[in-house]
């Protein structure tokens, strides 16, 4: 029997891709009540509205939303707990994307694709395939194409869409299906059928094993689907200039395709963004 030895960098990349697809994080946790979440953060003196970078390592990633969260009526407490559930998941997935992006940038510094050794070429092929691009040695724009796709989603934007799509984490889809972003599927076995679905519709809302899977799928969708090509182009341009707050506002306007209501969805997202001061979450590094 022959054994193939992989070099350290390639092993790292393979593990990274696998973890992004089938992640079972050690810091993930299941809780039965939202009060457990509340107690943990109070015990550690962590205020989600004044979160410091030094506190990020203390954040917990919850696999599911507690069943009793749907009955929490205190609006301020509901928002606080939701942010404590959603922010760590968004941060974690953005960090995974940053690692992939760094690999691409490091390779680009070495020169053209043809200058890469076999280890780097294999790594580049893995990332290229994952992000639905065609790999050829002659493509001198491949690095540019990859960097346009392999990029983070602003935390404020990801929070805003999760708020709308999951009803602050209290929707049936969020509680029963770990679905924070209302992504559709046409496989009835993979999703939950909306109770008020039009008779001529056949879609369901996709279910996930864990909340983190929902966040990862959402980010992957934004970073690869053709409907968000303009979003990705503008992200590449605006990330180089201007204040973060204004950058996010520009990007919000490019998400009309995310919902059937189009422009009204953008208006709704802008309202959620402003009324909840979501831009504050973009300043945490």
Language model features with spans:
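Catalytic cores of secreted/periplasmic lytic hydrolases that degrade extracellular macromolecules
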Residues: 24-160, 164, 168-285
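Bacterial N-terminal signal peptides that target proteins for export
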Residues: 3-12
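Bacterial N-terminal signal peptides
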Residues: 13-21
């Amino acid at each position: 029997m022959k054994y193939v030895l992989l070099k350290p960098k390639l092993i790292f990349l393979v593990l990274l891709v696998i973890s992004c697809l089938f992640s079972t994080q050690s810091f993930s946790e299941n809780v039965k009540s939202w009060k457990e979440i509340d107690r943990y953060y109070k015990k550690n003196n962590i205020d989600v509205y004044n979160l410091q970078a030094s506190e990020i390592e203390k954040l917990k990633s919850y696999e599911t939303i507690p069943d009793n969260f749907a009955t929490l009526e205190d609006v301020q407490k509901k928002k606080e707990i939701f942010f404590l559930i959603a922010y760590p998941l968004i941060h974690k997935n953005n960090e995974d994307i940053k690692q992939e992006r760094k690999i691409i940038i490091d390779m680009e510094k070495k020169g053209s694709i043809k200058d890469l050794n076999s280890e780097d070429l294999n790594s580049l092929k893995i990332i290229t395939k994952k992000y639905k691009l065609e790999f050829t040695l002659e493509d001198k724009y491949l690095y540019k194409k990859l960097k346009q796709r392999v990029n983070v989603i602003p935390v404020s934007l990801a929070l805003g869409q999760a708020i709308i799509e999951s009803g602050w984490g209290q929707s049936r889809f969020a509680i029963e299906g770990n679905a924070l972003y209302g992504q559709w599927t046409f496989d009835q076995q993979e999703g939950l059928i909306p109770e008020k679905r039009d008779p001529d519709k056949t879609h369901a809302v996709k279910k996930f094993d864990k909340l983190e899977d929902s966040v990862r799928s959402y980010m992957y969708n934004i970073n690869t689907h053709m409907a968000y090509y303009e979003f990705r182009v503008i992200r590449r341009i605006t990330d180089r200039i201007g204040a973060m707050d204004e950058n996010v506002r520009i990007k919000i306007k490019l998400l009309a395709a995310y919902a059937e209501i189009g422009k009204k969805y953008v208006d709704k997202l802008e309202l959620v963004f402003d009324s909840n001061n979501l831009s504050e979450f973009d300043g945490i590094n």
